[in-house]
Structures are given as structure tokens and as C-alpha cells.
Amino acid sequence: MDPFVGWFQKEQEGPSLCTWLKIWETNAQEMGALLNQQLQQATTINGSTSSSSSSSNSGNNNNNNNNNIINNTITNTTNNTGNNSSAKPYLSRPYSSLNRVLNFRADSLEILQQQQQQQQLNGTTQRNSTNINTTSGGSTSSSADSTTNRDNNSPANSSSTNGPGAGTGTSTGAGGTGTNSPATTASSTAATTTGPATSMSDTSNNPPQSTTTPASRTNSIYYNPSRKKRPENKAGGAHYYMNNHMEMIAKYKGEPWRKPDYPYGEGVIGLHEEIEHFYQYVLPTPCEHAIRNEVVKRIEAVVHSIWPQAVVEIFGSFRTGLFLPTSDIDLVVLGLWEKLPLRTLEFELVSRGIAEACTVRVLDKASVPIIKLTDRETQVKVDISFNMQSGVQSAELIKKFKRDYPVLEKLVLVLKQFLLLRDLNEVFTGGISSYSLILMCISFLQMHPRGIYHDTANLGVLLLEFFELYGRRFNYMKIGISIKNGGRYMPKDELQRDMVDGHRPSLLCIEDPLTPGNDIGRSSYGVFQVQQAFKCAYRVLALAVSPLNLLGIDPRVNSILGRIIHITDDVIDYREWIRENFEHLVVVDRISPLPTAAPTAYATANGAPKYVIMPSGAVVQQLYHHPVQVPTAHGHSHAHSHSHGHAHPGAHLCQPYVTGTTVSAVTTTTTMAVVTVGVSAGGVQQQQQQQNATAHTHSQQQTQNQSQSRHRRGSTSSGDDSEDSKDGDVVETTSSAQEVVDIALSTPNGLANMSMPMPVHAVGMPASNSWSGNGNGNGNSSSSTGSSPEIAHIAAQEMDPELEDQQQQQQHQETSGGNGFIRPGDVGTGSNRGGGDGSGGRNYNQRNNHNSSGYYHQQYYVPPPMQQQLSKSNSSSNYHQQHHHSHSHGNHSHRQQHHHQQQHHHQQRPQHLRVGGGNRYQKSLGGSPIISAGNASNSSSNCSNSSSSSGSNNSRLPPLRGTLVNSSSAISIISISSESSIASSSSSSSRSGQDQQRDER
């Protein structure tokens, strides 16, 4: 095995290890032909110093004293490589690294050097001195260079005269790298300065003594266990034994994920079980999540104190949930600046005590200027960038693929730890970034011949196949990677035509799925080292899981996964340190038990759980502060909030959870007011039977069924707003003065059988939009309760009060399940509870359609003056809506004419403002989905046969459609949702709309 990318296993230790080291060191250092030449040169230099008393030296002071001369003055000049007598000047490795190897096990190079030194000692006269005392620059704070003094058996004093730039030298035996030759310990006395030169007086004792002090033992420096980036915390990039990796795992043995009494299986079964346990171990604890949230809050407070209108967003691994315990936090500040205020923010962060000045670095010359800092209290590392919205878009894209491939996150976390140990996880050091690694994993799963869409796949087999593909099979020279449109491998010649600025494809060419022409792996110049590491890992794991079991590995005793990855003692100590010092941030206060399969809650606030522990161990945090209940705007909204879908303005304002077939939540965010679709099935047919009790309600239902095709495809607002909402219209909701933080981590098995808290309704938005099917896709009878305000209002006035109360009670039971939580069976993308062919889960047959429909598009920040203009526009539209509530009875022809005008207006709208495709859904920044509404052609055909109750006019359309609406500056919201919301598929609704249209014809 190549020791530069891995380490030796237990079965490799023995007599053959020294031979292997000798072969490797001879070949790697190219010492075969040069070793004799170097030794001869060293012998020649030593012979010349015996006859003449002059030697050359640069950073090291070599004082060679000859007893034939009583007072010997030595002039020191330049020598860039160190001690000449030990044959070290021509070695490429530092001597301290070789000494660490010697402390563990002597290699061939050290043995040869010792033999040569012994021969030199035997060939010299007794009156020549060959003692070496080396003081390392790291052991003394007064000198950066090492001082070497050679004195032996001489009663006379020798003085060395340094150049004008020399300083006072100190010689200590503690930092020396002594040899086995007879030596005397030289004690340095006071140094006297004469003119421009520095005179150093050394006295020596006559009795010969041998002193050997390992430098690696004396230079032990204590580091805070939270510091991630340390040169010695790597297992690759240098020899395994050169960086004391065995000492780094001596305390906990490097395998804390293994369960002592667990019966691990043989081969790939045991490897799969270990990967599962590793994933469970590295998941963040509630305390670790809390400290990260506190760090984000402190930095966000500083940013808002400087720029009240700025927006702070989280992206990267903390947003996607694919972060290790020592990973950093990636933040982006969105605002309007002519010049990025890097130095301003740096000064404020240091002056307010967020970070120490020595830990803050401003990389203003980088392609993406960032501020790197380490939080003073928690030692969490943070990277802050400005106006880089591509990171948020990439995070949302990764979260989408996490839902499509449940095994993705487990595979990625193992690979990230694998590259971290080998120092191959940073682009500026030649490695590959986390984003590149995730895209490689996505491409691997997309191109897998078996089609990995379920979470029951063997992770051990997948890990082996990943190492085999990118370590042995993949052609890095000619092939590029693309994950768009279902994924493919493409020739680099084809990619070069699309590259921006005429750049050639890099060695690791990965097409950016969000920015055409951008190469993600362009800066990874050390791809061959990564390939070599993958290749080595494949060989190690293949031998370990082989059915022949040639290595004699017992999986119940020896770890298979531990042969390629370890968790160092520093990481384990850091997690324990976090738990001991910051456990007060998570107040354990158990409340009443939740329904079956529901999360366990901690630290409730106003009845809503603050922290939720998922069954897999993942942490979901809902609130930092208590939600503020906004008073009811008018009685009509409160009276009909259940029967007509008019949301209470302050009802559950802060709860972030949403499922695919239930009413979704609307949270006020700093960057966007998210409008989601709610689908409540089960009581639609009974409601239609109740409405058929009277002739008037029967006629109203016919009108309602005619207009259903317009609301069926993802409309989220009232009847006069359906066309606007499906085009990504932004609605500004009521803002509160409290800070809301919504954090949810993904679960390993998706959200198929997980209960969620009660959904939230937006201010002025419908609470439900239900449909039901008859099982064969034909003759679907739909009810758009809450979609058309005036129709629902008229029906409510004509309805008997008892029927209305019964309807309200039924809808409340269907929505809340009686316990305030959605039933597990309600969760699923594209499922129809009223019938039809919905499966309640993901429809993986439509994967290519989802991939071909495009990706998440991030919108932009809008200044407050434009927000006020948009608010006025929304206010005028609400006025027109209320006006039509009271005056549109019997004006069917007028509504029909107005609907055609509005339809014609939307057909002429620019296509770039339309969001989504027929089978596409989007995720908002806060984790709540935005249901994209079908194609424009289907929209026009469906809406042409329906009567509209629209109460808006051209003033209803804001001038900045498709842009983000920032809330007031007092609102501060951070959304880090990963799996807490799943958008319902619009494909089923589109098919239902087409079937309804055929029935009407």
C-alpha cells in the first residue's frame, strides 16, 4: 500500500515491515544512486574541517574545535540545509520528521546514517570533536534558528564569531536531536557583544556523555480540542507514522461509532452496519446544534446593527445537514454595496468580542472574497461571504437530491471524513471541495445500473463501488460529469464549447448544474492524489470484505470501516467539551407524550416544542423565541377560518413544518414571504352532498366545479389571485417583532412515516385546497374549498348552521388528526387520500421528468422602498377583493369577461418570470415549498372553461414580480430546513385538471 495515502494495518506489522519501509524510502526519496555520493561528500567535508578550522553554516552554528589550536576562531557563513557531517543537506524531508519515524521504528535511511556516523567516529583522531547539540527553533522562543556546537575533550575554550546580523544564540539540550555518538552536553554561558559581531562563549565538560532527547516528545503543545485545522491532525499527505497518527487515536482507538455488544455481520454486511452506526454517531446533538445557532445569531445581530436592511443567509453543509462535528458554518450577507465591506465587518466582529483578532482572516483577493473567523466562545469556524446567492441555490438543489436518494447523506459523510483525514478536502491545497464530492456522489447514484432510489441499499457495496469507479475506472482525462437531466458522462470536448471565457475543462471536470459553463472542479489540481486515495481504499476494503477472508478479520473485534477512516481523540474531546460547557442552551423539559412515531420534544415555548429529537437522532429546532400572536384583522376571517380556508393572521405563525398532502405552513422570512399549497382530502365528497341539500347550494357547486380547473394546479391564494400565485407572485405577510429561527435536519429514511406538528396558515391565504379521485383517473370530482372566496362565502351564508358546524368539525379532524399532528399516513409526495393511484410516497418512475424540468432559482433582495410600493399594491388588491365579496353576486358575465382579460394578460407575460415546470416543485429559503403551477398552455386551456371570481385588476400585479420581499428590519429570520417540508407533486393535479376538462366537454 502507498503509505502517502493510507496507513499500515495490524496484520502488516512484523519482520516484513522494515523491509517494506526500506524499499519504499529508497524508491520514494530517490536515494538509491545518490546515497553513496551524499555520504562521500559528507566524509570529504569532515576531513577538510579536521585540517583547516573553517566551516560553513547558515541558520545553524556548527563549531568544530580542533585541540591542536588553543584559540580557534571560526567564521560562520551560509549553509541552507543543516548539519554537513550527518549527510542531511541533500534530503528533501525535514530532519524532525525522520526523527519521529526513528522514535517509532527506525527505517533504512536512519540506519544507514547511523552506520556512516559510526564509521566517521572510528576514523577520526581523538583530538577532533564530533559532538552535536541542536536546538530546534520551536523549542525556544528567542531564536528561530537552531544552534549546533561541537565540543569534545578539549580543555580550551573556543569562540565563534558570527556575522553582523547574528543574534544571541542559546543552546539547550531539551530540543536536541542527539545521535548515538559519544558527546558532551554543552552549556551556553552569557553572550557578549563586541561591535557588530556577537561573541558566544561555550564551556564543555571533559567526561564524555551521550544525550538523546526526542524532539517530538519535548515539543508537545496542548491544543484546544475544538481547533480543527492542525498540520498534525491528518492521516495522509505524508507517511502514516510521520504525523503520529497512532498517538492521535491512542485514547479512544479511533472507532467510537462501534457498539461493543453489537453482532456485526461478515463482509459487506458488517461494513454496511458500521456505516449506519457511523452516520448515527456523527449526527449533531441538540447541544451542538444550539451552539451553532447561537453563533449565527450573534453574527447576524452584528450585521443588522451595521446594515439594518441586510439579509443573512446560511448555506453550505449546515443548511443541507451534511456536516461533520468539526465543519464550519457558511454565511452570506445580502445587501446593496458598491464595494464589499469586508474590513468594516471584520472590525465590528473583533471589537464586539465575537472573535479574536488573531483568528480573523480577510481573503479579499480570492475569487470569492470571504471573512474567515473562529467564534471566541464555542471555537466554531465561520466563513462569511457577500452577495453570493449561488450557495443558497446549491444547498436547495442538494436537499432535493437528498430526498430522491436517501443513501446520499450517509455515503457523503463517510467520504468527507475520509478526505478530511488525508488533507484532501480543501481546494486551496489541491483537494476537492464538499460540493464537488456531493456532485460526484449524485452522478454515481444517477448512473448506477441498479438505480438506487430506496434506503435499503447496502451501503458497504455502494462505498466499494464508489471507490472502484473514481479510483480505478473513471477516465479523468477525457470524461466530464454532469448531473443535469438525469445525469450523464460527456466528453470534455463537448463541455469546452460551453465553457465561459474559453477555459479548457479541468482534470476533474464537473458541470455546474446551476451555472452553465462553470466548471466546479477547476481549482482541484491534486485530483490524482484523490484518485490514488480512492484506489487504495478500494484495495483495503476489498480485502477486508472478501469471502475468503484472507486477512483473518473478525468483524466483531476488528472494524472494517476503521481500516480507512478514524475519528481522532481531539474530535471526541471537543464534542465532550461542548456538552459539558454548553448544555445549558438545551433545557431538557419533557412534555406530554406525542403520538406514535412522533418526535420527542424538549424546551417548549407557548405550547410549541423548541427542540425535537427525530427517531434517527437528528435534531430539529423550531423556535428561539416565543411566537407572537397577531390579533385578528376582521371577524370574517376568524369565523370562517376552518370552513372557507381564510387563515387566521396570527395562527401558528412560527411553526415551520409541512407535508406533501396536508396544509403547509407559511413563515415570515427576511428574504421572502413563502406561500404554500395545502391539500386536505377526505371530507370533500361529504361536503358536496351537504351542499346538494338545497337547490341554491347545488347551483353554486356547479359554478365552483367549473372554476376548479384554474385552482387545481397549485394555486395558493384566493380566487382572484390564482393566476398570479402560480407564476411565483410574492405575498407579504404580517410581520412580527420577534426573531424566528427554523432549523430542521434530514432523517436517514426520509419523511415517509414521520408525524409532524400542526401546519400553519398564512395571513389571507386559503387553509386547504382539496381534491379527490375515483381510482381510474376519470371523472374526478373536485372541491376547491377556500380557493374562491366569494363562492365559498355565498355557500356559507346559504348553508344551514348545523351543517356548517358539522363541516367545520370534520375539516378540523381531517386536518389535525385530533392531536394537533398530521397522521403518518398523510405524509407523501403526490398521494391522493380520496382515491386514485397515489402511492403515498415518492414516484420514482418520474425521476427523469423531475431532473429535466430544471432546478431551483434563487430570487433577489428588494430594498425597503420597493417593499412599501409592493405592500401598497397588495393592499389595493385586498380592497378590490373585499369589494367583489359584496358586489359580485349575479355578475357572472362580468367575471367571465374579466377572467379572459386576466388570462390574456398572463399569456403575454415574459417567460423568464414564470417559475417551474409541469412536474417541478421548488423549495423556498425557509424550507417551505412553493408549488409550481404547471405549463402555461395547460393553464390557458383549463381556465378558458371556468368562471372566474377574480377581484383584481392590473394594479394587482406588482412591478417586481418574482423578486424577494424583505420584511421589516426588526424581523430576523434564519431558515436552515433540510427535510422538514416536501412539496406535493403538481403532476397529479395537472392530470386531474385535464381529466376534469374532458368531463366538462
Curated annotation (Swiss-Prot):
Compositionally skewed regions (Basic residues) per UniProt: 635-649, 881-912
Reported cofactor(s): Mn(2+)
Keywords: Cytoplasm, Isomerase, Magnesium, Manganese, Metal-binding, mRNA processing, Nucleotidyltransferase, Transferase
Pfam families the UniProt entry points to: MTPAP-like_central, PAP_assoc
Residues annotated as binding Mn(2+): 328, 330
InterPro entries, per the entry: MTPAP-like_central, NT_sf, PAP_assoc, Trf4-like
Disulfide bond entries: none
Chain intervals for the UniProt region annotation (Disordered): 44-92, 115-238, 631-652, 687-740, 767-963, 977-1001
Molecular-function GO terms, alphabetical: isomerase activity; metal ion binding; poly(A) RNA polymerase activity
Ranges annotated as biased composition (Gly residues): 164-178, 827-841
Comment on bound cofactor: Low activity with Mg(2+).
Record note on disruption phenotype: RNAi-mediated knockdown causes lethality at the third-instar larval or early pupal stage.
Compositional bias segments (type: Polar residues): 844-854
Name of the protein in its database record: Non-canonical poly(A) RNA polymerase protein Trf4-1
Organism: Drosophila melanogaster
Lineage of producing organism: Eukaryota, Metazoa, Ecdysozoa, Arthropoda, Hexapoda
Gene name tied to this protein: Trf4-1
